[in-house]
Design a protein with these regions (language model features):
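Non-catalytic, mostly N-terminal accessory regions of nucleic-acid modification and defense proteins
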Residues: 1-196, 263-271, 382-385, 409-416, ...
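Conserved Class I SAM-dependent methyltransferase catalytic core
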Residues: 7-8, 14, 20-36, 187, ...
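Short, contiguous acidic/charged loop-to-helix segments that flank catalytic cores in large enzymes
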Residues: 18, 294-303, 308-322, 353-363, ...
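Active-site catalytic pocket residues across diverse enzymes, especially alpha/beta-hydrolases
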Residues: 41, 226, 230, 334
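Short acidic (Asp/Glu) and glycine-rich catalytic loops that position anionic groups and cofactors
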Residues: 166, 260-264, 304-310, 345-354, ...
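Conserved S-adenosyl-L-methionine
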Residues: 176-285, 289-302, 324, 351-353, ...
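Feature representing long, continuous alpha-helical segments
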Residues: 220, 248, 285-287, 324-332, ...
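Flexible, glycine-/basic-rich loop-and-beta segments that form/coincide
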Residues: 389-494
Length: 673
């Protein structure tokens, strides 16, 4: 409905000089909503007012009492319509506010979050209010005419509203809450892929949620996409949004489309789930990247402490970036599979961080591990850079499902679509590239085909690659490798003084403290010992020589080693009092062993030839499976799709140099004449 959107957009002409261009939406959007609701309520307005007047002084639940009469999940009890407000120029401000206050609370909430009264006051101050009211009062946004024929359907109105949003985002410097339509089209195309029952069965009803709804773009495009294939299907839309104005836009968009506005909630999803008992057939989101979750930390940690009963049981990412928490939230909201039926699917946009951030055992790695172990990860699509309005970084579409078909179980499909776009004629913020319909269709085909792809278009240069992996491919074990501590021992004056000043020394029993002090005093300050056993024997002998009968205990000997030892790679491996070789924390290393590979075989092949004195720390085990080596996960697109390009041959390089030299000499001769 571009024509309808253009008609409404023309009203912005009245705002020039009074408002900045990026402020137009504060006027145009709420007035569009106001006029649409005014029009659709017109046929039942008088009946609603009669019922309201009869009970207005009684304690009635007006929502339950009046919505059946209005025919919508909202109503208006005021005596004003927008054309009626336009009839009284002197009272336009007060009458308009009275009209707004006459709406049911769910609609007033939208205008409140828009800050609409403040906008009305500014319009009045700039002498634009009456002109704007008059212009919108003349705009026909009726759903049906007097004969019952459609004028502007909910679908038409929704498309027009979306077109207006797109126009406003084109002139806005921000656009953070707006996911580009081409990205959404790809997301919902893949999300619905294979669900023939949804796309073809008349009367089918499904639910869809977005926990970071923004202006509702993902939800509205999903509904439109579904209706292209099945206009008799119903997709019930749910969303939650933190920012007040974007929440108001989203709720208004859903209202205009005939959705239940109660399904759009305002608030931080991480802090509180506003749809606590609702699960979804589909979910899609573009959560913020690199935004810390500190404001919701208390609530998140309480949820995590609930274990499986909470939303964040698998793990918590670093406080600096909460995007993986939104994925966990969505996983907790998937429609469960019951006796092979039901289940849910998720599409979510992430940057590169959730693919590989976090070491083995860390929060991010544990979240990936949980998703992979439960076989929820279906596919990840790498998108081109420069696809979003507010960032040019690489982004990825994750597709998650608890109802994977048999042929996809235990498998993960990676699609490299970073070469599948074309440059836009005009940049929108940082967005320089977009998906064409052909790009989307080809990526969706690669998803549906579920097999290796290596495609290149000779004319455009666009490329598409895909590979199928076993889910275990993305697991590894972090095995700790130790090497011996090698020290020489010498009782220098400085070392002895430091030993005697240590609090641990002063806390030794009197007999042991005196024995240690006497023994180190008897040592030759110039003597150097490169073997720990020899040094301990000398120390014990010195104590005995001083008349101390009781052998020095483990604690004094440990203190002596701490202060009288200096690292020396030429010394023998240092042992403790039990004869066990001590490891050197400074030489400690880790090897990342592919999951399933025998760690001893790996050690013999990759470590022992380089460090013959090294050994595996078998006390470093995974908390879950109890085996040596902590389990970690990562999904490295660069490695999986890396293509080795051999260096040019010496002959080729030599020929190029000779060619350049010849050109240079020809140029010199030309200059010399």
């Amino acid at each position: 409905m571009a024509k309808l959107a253009d008609l409404i957009w023309k009203n912005a002409e009245l705002l020039r000089g009074a408002f900045k261009e990026n402020e137009y939406r504060k006027v145009i959007l709420p007035f569009t909503i106001l006029r649409r609701l005014d029009c659709v309520l017109a046929p039942t307005r008088e009946a609603v007012r009669i019922k309201y007047e009869a009970v207005k002084d009684k304690n009635y639940d007006l929502d339950k009492f009046l919505t059946p009469t209005s025919g919508y999940p909202f109503f208006n009890t005021s005596k004003f319509t927008l054309p009626g407000v336009a009839e009284s120029p002197d009272d336009v401000r007060d009458n308009l506010e009275a009209m707004i206050n006459g709406f049911s609370q769910n609609v007033r909430d939208i205008f409140e979050k828009f800050g609409f009264i403040a906008t009305i006051d500014k319009l009045a101050e700039k002498n634009r209010l009456f002109l704007v009211v008059q212009r919108f009062a003349e705009t026909d946004l009726r759903a049906i005419d007097e004969k019952g024929k459609p004028v502007v359907t909910n679908h038409d109105m929704g498309q027009a509203f979306e077109e207006l949003l797109r126009k406003f985002n084109d002139v806005s410097p921000a656009g953070e809450q707006y996911t580009p339509r081409d990205v959404i089209e790809l997301m919902v195309t893949v999300l619905f892929e294979g669900d023939d029952d949804v796309l073809s069965v008349p009367g089918v009803v499904r639910t869809m949620g977005d926990p970071t709804a923004g202006t509702g773009g993902i939800l509205s495009v999903a509904e439109e996409h579904l209706h292209k294939f099945n206009d008799r299907a119903t997709l019930k839309l749910f969303g939650q949004e933190l920012e007040d104005e974007t929440y108001a836009i989203c709720k208004a968009d859903m209202l205009i489309r005939g959705q239940d506005p109660a399904n759009i909630a305002n608030g931080d999803t991480l802090e509180k789930d506003k749809h606590p008992h609702q699960t979804f057939d589909y979910q899609a989101a573009n959560p913020p990247y690199g935004v810390e979750w500190k404001p919701a930390e208390d609530a998140v940690r309480k949820e995590h402490a609930k274990g499986a009963a909470g939303r964040f049981a698998p793990g918590l990412p670093a406080i600096r970036d909460g995007q993986m928490l939104f994925s966990l939230h969505m996983l907790s909201k998937m429609q469960p599979v019951v006796k092979g039926k039901g289940g849910g699917r998720i599409g979510v946009v992430h940057n590169g961080s959730p693919l590989f951030t976090g070491d083995a055992g860390g929060g991010e790695s544990e979240i990936r591990r949980w998703i992979l172990e439960h076989d929820y990860l279906d596919c990840i699509v790498a998108m081109p850079t420069d696809m979003f309005y507010n960032t040019n970084i690489a982004t990825y579409l994750w597709f998650i499902s608890n109802r994977k078909p048999p042929e996809r179980k235990g498998k993960v499909l990676l699609i490299d679509a970073s070469g599948m776009s074309h440059l836009m004629k005009k940049n929108l913020g940082k967005k320089r590239r977009e998906f064409s319909e052909d790009c989307i269709a080809r990526i969706a085909k690669a998803y549906a085909g579920f097999k290796a792809v290596n495609w290149r278009d000779a004319n455009s240069g666009r490329t598409l690659k895909a590979k199928v992996f076993d889910r275990e491919h993305f697991f590894y074990r972090k095995v700790t490798i130790e090497r011996p501590l090698r020290c020489r021992f010498q009782a220098t004056a400085e070392a002895v003084a430091a030993l005697l000043a240590d609090k641990a020394y002063t806390k030794l029993p009197d007999e042991q403290r005196d024995a240690l002090k006497t023994a180190v005093a008897k040592l030759d300050a110039a003597a150097i010992y490169t073997d720990a056993d020899t040094f301990r024997a000398v120390l014990q002998k010195a104590a005995k020589k001083a008349g101390i009968k009781k052998v020095l205990g483990a604690k004094p000997l440990e203190l002596a080693r701490k202060y009288l030892a200096t690292r020396d790679k030429t010394a023998s491996p240092t042992t403790n009092e039990k004869g066990e070789v001590l490891s050197d924390s400074e030489l400690r290393d880790a090897e990342y062993v592919q999951f399933g590979e025998d760690i001893d075989s790996y050690f013999d092949r990759e470590v022992a030839p380089h460090w013959p004195d090294a050994w595996i720390n078998r006390d470093s085990k995974d908390d879950k499976d109890g085996l040596v080596g902590v389990v970690g996960t990562e999904i490295n697109f660069n490695r999986e799709f890396y293509v080795y390009t051999p260096p040019r041959s010496r002959e080729t390089i030599r020929a190029e140099i000779e060619t350049m030299e010849k050109r240079f000499m020809d140029m010199l001769r030309g200059v010399a004449g």
